[in-house]
């Protein structure tokens, strides 16, 4: 599973992070201390569950939960707080569980188990129907073999050839798709497009940037042992240090 811990207290974040790691059911656990950091993480990636404190510095966790609930691919929410007075409101927001500080390993394990059951039920719900399963398989095959990407902008769907896509990047909550024909701006997260254009030509070079390597024009050495890429449309992107190893491997630069 993939999770985010949202708490403005570093000690609480670190404690919960440690306890979740002991359960060993998570492939990724990110941490955020406020609403803006949380929303930024949700733009870049998909998560299964958010452990959310209620009293945050910049906004109430209840308000954040309401925003998350409206998202297309909303993760499950577990409130993790020192106060039990908001429990009713939390469950009105469809929280899957509500755990109190100080945290107990057994209680956290129970909450995680609820999420696993819910994720499993979602899978079973789809697999129970032959028709649904068949359609899902067909859709998955289309996604894998499709050479076009539909992009919806202002209630109009543009059909773009994958070969024409130069880069996809996120800035201030807006996802921009640069193509050889035009640039398109949407509110879909980067992970949405990463899944749809999962081919050997596309790679992440930064948490906020996905590029088509066939449109790289030049590679220059940059600060902190990284690279700057100039694309065929003359846009420049930096390869972040955390993606350097993968980039070198995919470009045969090792």
UniProtKB/Swiss-Prot annotation:
A single cellular component GO annotation: cytoplasm
Highest taxon in the source lineage: Bacteria
Keyword Transcription included in the entry's annotation: yes
Disulfide-bonded cysteines: none
All residue ranges annotated as the HTH LytTR-type domain in the record: 149-253
Major localization class: cytoplasm
One Pfam family cited in the UniProt record for this chain: Response_reg
PTM-bearing positions, type 4-aspartylphosphate: 53
InterPro entries assigned: CheY-like_superfamily, LytR-like, LytTR_DNA-bd_dom, Sig_transdc_resp-reg_receiver
GO molecular function, one term: DNA binding
Cited function: Member of the two-component regulatory system LytR/LytS that probably regulates genes involved in cell wall metabolism.
Name this protein carries in UniProt: Sensory transduction protein LytR
Organism encoding this protein: Staphylococcus saprophyticus subsp. saprophyticus (strain ATCC 15305 / DSM 20229 / NCIMB 8711 / NCTC 7292 / S-41)
Name of the gene encoding the protein in the UniProt record: lytR
């Amino acid at each position: 599973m993939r999770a985010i811990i949202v708490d403005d207290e570093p000690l609480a974040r670190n404690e919960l992070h440690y306890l979740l790691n002991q359960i060993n059911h998570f492939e990724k656990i990110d941490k955020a201390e406020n609403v803006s950091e949380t929303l930024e993480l949700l733009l870049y990636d998909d998560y299964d569950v958010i452990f959310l404190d209620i009293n945050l510095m910049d906004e109430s966790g209840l308000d954040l939960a309401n925003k998350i609930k409206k998202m297309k691919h909303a993760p499950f929410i577990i409130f993790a707080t020192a106060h039990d007075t908001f429990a009713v409101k939390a469950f009105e927001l469809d929280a899957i569980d509500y755990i109190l500080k100080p945290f107990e390993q057994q209680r956290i394990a129970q909450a995680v188990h609820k999420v696993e059951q819910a994720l499993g039920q979602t899978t079973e719900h789809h697999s129970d129907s032959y028709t649904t399963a068949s359609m899902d398989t067909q859709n998955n095959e289309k996604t894998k073999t499709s050479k076009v990407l539909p992009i919806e902008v202002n209630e109009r769907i543009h059909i773009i050839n994958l070969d024409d896509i130069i880069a996809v990047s996120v800035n201030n909550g807006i996802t921009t798709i640069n193509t050889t024909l035009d640039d398109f701006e949407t509110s879909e997260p980067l992970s949405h497009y990463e899944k749809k254009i999962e081919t050997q030509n596309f790679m992440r070079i930064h948490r906020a940037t996905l590029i088509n390597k066939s449109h790289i024009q030049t590679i220059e050495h940059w600060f902190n042992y990284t690279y700057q890429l100039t694309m065929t449309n003359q846009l420049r992107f930096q390869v972040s240090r955390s993606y350097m190893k993968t980039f070198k491997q995919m470009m045969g630069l090792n």
